[in-house]
């Protein structure tokens, strides 16, 4: 690893503008045989996504990944999405009952368009075996596997049959893996993404560490096809987290997938809970993300997302906020 850096250490360098208005810029992305409005997906976490929001995102042309923390609801969810004429995108773990679940889908003739195998340390035989199991029983499902943080892991999961890999170990705002274990991509997530993307032959999802909309453009520059985001999507009207009022202000809870709130027990805890200010409607945030990304594309000197992949950059080592708490 030569240069190690994170999002706030990088500035992208503008190229000559070719559009009259940023509204001419197209932020859409192809992923798994579908076109989505943005290269952005809300994290598959219990306080970020639920069935209702999944329907809304799919209806409006956005990608989503349903979480895996209410496993018994997944079959009905897939049936419901199919009945609505929408794509289904679910998450699975690697425990024995998940193998049985995949076989049950085959028996019921249900093929989710997307299946995300989602565990904290995705470079493992457990994930490789699950990829192969899904590919055997549901060959038409697009399999996303993760999470990983090295080129070796990306290559191995791709070779096992993964259609995309998810990169990021512990950079999230409610993830404390970096503190509890000493491992992960926290603090150098963007460099890890770049390192992994160079090894990849299939799409990569950058997962975690996004704090501003500009970080989406930076992720695209360093090889992400999709960018998974938790904290920026937490706290919306549609977010599943509980709402509380404090000093006349509204907040919503947001917790990590390996937190005790998630697990219902204090065992191998690598996540925490926080309260985020209530942010209004999620579609407004998605619109703002789109507008900001359109601006990014115009600064990149193009009118499509791919223009961002070709710009130069500088490493500024944490100075872009000049010590401001952004």
Curated annotation (Swiss-Prot):
Keywords: NADP, Oxidoreductase. It catalyses: IMP + NH4(+) + NADP(+) = GMP + NADPH + 2 H(+). Its EC number is 1.7.1.7. NADP(+) binds at residues 204-227. It comes from the Bacteria. The keyword Oxidoreductase applies. One of its GO terms (biological process) is purine nucleotide metabolic process. GO terms for molecular function: GMP reductase activity. Pfam families: IMPDH. The keyword Protein biosynthesis does not apply. Disulfide bonds: none annotated. Belongs to the IMPDH/GMPR family. GuaC type 2 subfamily. PANTHER family: GMP REDUCTASE (PTHR43170:SF5). This is GMP reductase.
